[in-house]
């Protein structure tokens, strides 16, 4: 390659990387995978090293990311710069990292390292003065980020006040979305026909950038912290001499710290930890795209310093990319228990993360339009959250012109009934649709619902084909003679299944509500409804206003639930379940001792805050996150926040934790220990 050819390619790569930085850091909507981005950056680095005259101070190899949009949130300049990390992709590159340290320090290793999971989320910086949180901000370009304080404070584990810390302190960490929360959020968005998130990192970034903190609060974000900016030297003078000790110091101060960190000696020791964690990667509750390797001794950090982009004492050792290219051969349409029609892509089979992948959900019309995906396209697939096969992007550069657009059916693929279109969602309105019946029974019997073990998909199909069941209530009318003689169903299997069905009657109201598939009702909302109303009879008579008082219920969900509760077919189903002996009382019964009262909690309590909130709701109270004139009481714990000042200004009564428990005892006749 000549110098001019290299110059042209370097300029192309810089423009391309800057564009993808903008998509990744600012819009939180990347167009390419991490592996593809790493390949571009590596190519640029190699060309700059091969042709030093092409190096430039504004090259993306010397920068962290893209500046945030000024119109979104207030720009904040970090007191000390937030650096990115250089990457290693194999043991040789890890050894090269250690060799660079040896040369810089003028002595041979091996050195001690702290190894941490590289949680795939959004980097944030918390700034404290005299132990009080002043603001929290995203990393942005490393020098200027966006203030997102109110949204960060919806994460309950982030401390607002600290004791025994430097006067000015920066604490760095990662905000992420647990895989379970990510899958649940996408399921809700898909059900509404809205745009889904491609991965947990995008979901975390999008949730943290919400203008309404109430939306952020419902997204289940978590945070983990691992570094200091300002204040590090003072903490060192207190005797914290290693990264391992610093993580322990952060935990002592009340910060959430990802527990799976380890010490290792030398590159070979790090490699052993890396390989062990790689095997266990999919057991983690969060996405991790590698490990972070840091020289353990903090004093050596100052000797080594930083490049323009990254520290010389740390490196990200990335897990191998788990993405595959394949072709979309066809699209079929499935009908769910609510009648929603979902497109499913049929792929040329590929082996991905230990299993063969031949089908992938295409979610809804919005998703297909956004991807501009067509039958015959080459696509890049991965497993979202390490679980569900998903299309990362369409490889449009490989199109031949023979690809075909995806056409939505006008009639139900299962029963032939004409489909209804609600926004971007297509539904079958036929109550007798066999696919809806199948999915309703399958969901009812699932582990998180009524947990009827042994009632698998094949058996449900046979029961429907033989006319033995038409809906979930019919399960409780099955007899041994109905089952014996079905394919692969002997007398013992029949007895076991009937025993499981009988045991499912005792699951309680919260599991039953989830099992019945009320619109918008997942596990959390089912628990909240059960705690608020206590039994099915009270819920059936609930008003719109009462439903709106339930935590997590918005107006659209409340109206949809109310419509279902008033539906004669639903009421008849409930009646038949009750006659069959299905219990319809909450396992944790609610009450009316605090009905009509609204509580807000501030500060640290002796019991976990969520436990106290659940207790108040169980007794009929409403618990909110902000103080208003409608607040009945503000419960004040240790180190209260600004809610106390607002309560005083509005004249809202306050209770200490002890006074709260005395109030509960007076209202219920029971001590707090008996109620919790």
From Swiss-Prot:
InterPro entries from the UniProt entry: BRCT_dom (IPR001357), BRCT_dom_sf (IPR036420), DisA/LigA_HHH (IPR041663), DNA_ligase (IPR001679), DNA_ligase_AS (IPR018239), DNA_ligase_CS (IPR033136), DNAligase_adenylation (IPR013839), DNAligase_N (IPR013840)
The Gene Ontology CC terms held by the record are:
cytosol
Matching entries from CDD domains are given as: BRCT_DNA_ligase_like, LIGANc
Q: Which SUPFAM superfamilies match?
A: BRCT domain, DNA ligase/mRNA capping enzyme, catalytic domain, Nucleic acid-binding proteins, RuvA domain 2-like
Residues given in the record as NAD(+) binding sites:
34-38, 84-85, 116, 139, 174, 294, 318
Give the Enzyme Commission number: 6.5.1.2
Task: Provide details of activity as a function of temperature.
Answer: Thermostable.
**Domain BRCT residues, every copy:** 589-676
Q: What biological processes does GO assign it?
A: DNA repair; DNA replication
Its needed co-factors are:
Mg(2+); Mn(2+)
Report the catalytic activity.
NAD(+) + (deoxyribonucleotide)n-3'-hydroxyl + 5'-phospho-(deoxyribonucleotide)m = (deoxyribonucleotide)n+m + AMP + beta-nicotinamide D-nucleotide
What are the alphabetically sorted keywords of the record?
DNA damage, DNA repair, DNA replication, Ligase, Magnesium, Manganese, Metal-binding, NAD, Zinc
**Positions bound to Zn(2+):** 412, 415, 428, 433
EC class of this enzyme? Answer: ligase
Report the GO molecular function annotations.
Answer: DNA binding; DNA ligase (NAD+) activity; metal ion binding
The annotated active site, in chain numbering, is 118 (n6-amp-lysine intermediate)
Q: What Pfam families does the database record attribute to this sequence? A: BRCT, DNA_ligase_aden, DNA_ligase_OB, HHH_2, HHH_5, Nlig-Ia
Instruction: Report the function annotation for this chain.
Output: DNA ligase that catalyzes the formation of phosphodiester linkages between 5'-phosphoryl and 3'-hydroxyl groups in double-stranded DNA using NAD as a coenzyme and as the energy source for the reaction. It is essential for DNA replication and repair of damaged DNA.
Q: What's the family?
A: Belongs to the NAD-dependent DNA ligase family. LigA subfamily.
NCBIfam families annotated for this entry?
dnlj (TIGR00575), PRK07956.1 (NF005932)
Q: What is this protein called?
A: DNA ligase
Organism, per UniProt?
Thermus thermophilus (strain ATCC 27634 / DSM 579 / HB8)
> Source taxonomy lineage?
Bacteria, Thermotogati, Deinococcota, Deinococci, Thermales
* Protein encoded by which gene: ligA
């Amino acid at each position: 390659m000549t110098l001019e050819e290299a110059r042209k390619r370097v300029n192309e790569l810089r423009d391309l990387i800057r564009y993808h930085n903008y998509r990744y850091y600012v819009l939180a909507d990347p167009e390419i995978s991490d592996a593809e981005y790493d390949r571009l950056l590596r190519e640029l680095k190699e060309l700059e090293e091969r042709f030093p005259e092409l190096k430039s101070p504004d090259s993306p190899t010397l920068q962290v990311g893209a500046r945030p949009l000024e119109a979104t949130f207030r720009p904040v300049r970090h007191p000390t710069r937030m650096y990115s990390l250089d990457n290693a992709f194999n043991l040789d590159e890890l050894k090269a990292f250690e060799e660079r340290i040896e040369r810089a320090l003028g002595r041979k290793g091996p050195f001690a390292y702290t190894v941490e999971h590289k949680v795939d989320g959004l980097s944030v910086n918390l700034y404290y003065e005299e132990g009080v949180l002043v603001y929290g901000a995203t990393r942005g370009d490393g020098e200027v980020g966006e203030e997102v304080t109110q949204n960060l404070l919806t994460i309950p584990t982030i401390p607002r006040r600290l004791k025994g810390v430097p006067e000015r302190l920066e604490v760095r960490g990662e905000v992420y979305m647990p895989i379970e929360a990510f899958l649940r959020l996408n399921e809700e968005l898909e059900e509404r026909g809205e745009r889904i998130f491609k991965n947990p990192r995008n979901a975390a970034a999008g949730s943290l950038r919400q203008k309404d903190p109430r939306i952020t609060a419902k997204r289940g974000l978590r945070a983990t912290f691992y570094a200091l900016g300002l204040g590090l030297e003072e903490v060192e003078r207190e005797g914290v001499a290693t990264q391992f000790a610093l993580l322990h110091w952060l935990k002592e101060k009340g910060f959430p710290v990802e527990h799976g960190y380890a010490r290792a000696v030398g590159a070979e020791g790090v490699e052993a930890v890396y390989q062990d964690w790689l095997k266990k990667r999919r057991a983690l509750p969060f996405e991790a795209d590698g490990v972070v390797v840091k020289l353990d001794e903090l004093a050596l950090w100052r000797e080594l310093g930083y490049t323009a982009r990254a520290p010389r004492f740390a490196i990200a050792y990335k897990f191998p990319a788990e993405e595959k290219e394949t072709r979309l051969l066809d699209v079929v349409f499935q009908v769910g228990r609510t009648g929603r029609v979902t497109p499913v892509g049929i792929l040329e089979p590929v082996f991905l993360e230990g299993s063969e992948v031949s089908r992938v959900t295409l979610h809804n019309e919005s998703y297909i339009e956004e991807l501009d995906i067509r039958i015959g396209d080459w696509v890049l697939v991965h497993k979202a959250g390490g679980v569900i096969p998903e299309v990362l992007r369409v490889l449009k550069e490989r199109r031949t012109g023979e690809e075909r657009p995806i056409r939505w059916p006008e009639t139900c693929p299962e029963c032939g009934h004409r489909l209804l279109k609600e926004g971007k969602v297509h539904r079958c309105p036929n109550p007798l649709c066999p696919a809806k019946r199948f999915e309703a029974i399958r969901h009812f019997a699932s582990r998180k619902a009524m947990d009827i073990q042994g009632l698998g998909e094949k058996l449900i199909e046979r029961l429907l084909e033989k006319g033995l069941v038409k809906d979930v209530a019919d399960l409780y009318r099955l007899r041994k003679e109905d089952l014996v003689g079905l394919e692969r169903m002997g007398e013992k299997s029949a007895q076991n299944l009937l025993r499981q069905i009988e045991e499912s009657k005792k699951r309680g109201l919260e599991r039953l509500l989830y099992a019945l598939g009320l619109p918008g009702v997942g596990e959390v909302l089912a628990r909240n409804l059960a705690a608020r109303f206590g039994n099915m009879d009270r819920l059936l008579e609930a008003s719109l206003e009462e439903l709106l008082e339930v935590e997590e219920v918005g107006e659209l969900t409340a109206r949809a639930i109310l419509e279902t509760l008033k539906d004669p077919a639903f009421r008849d189903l409930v009646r038949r379940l009750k006659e069959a002996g299905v219990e319809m009382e909450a396992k944790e019964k609610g009450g009316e001792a605090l009905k009509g009262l609204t509580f807000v909690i501030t500060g640290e309590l002796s019991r976990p805050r969520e436990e106290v909130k659940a207790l108040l709701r169980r007794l009929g109270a409403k618990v909110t996150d902000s103080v208003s004139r409608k607040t009945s009481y503000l419960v004040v714990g240790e180190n209260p926040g600004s809610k106390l000042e607002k309560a005083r200004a509005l004249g809202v009564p306050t209770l200490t934790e002890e006074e709260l428990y005395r109030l509960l005892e007076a209202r219920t006749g029971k001590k707090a220990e008996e109620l919790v």
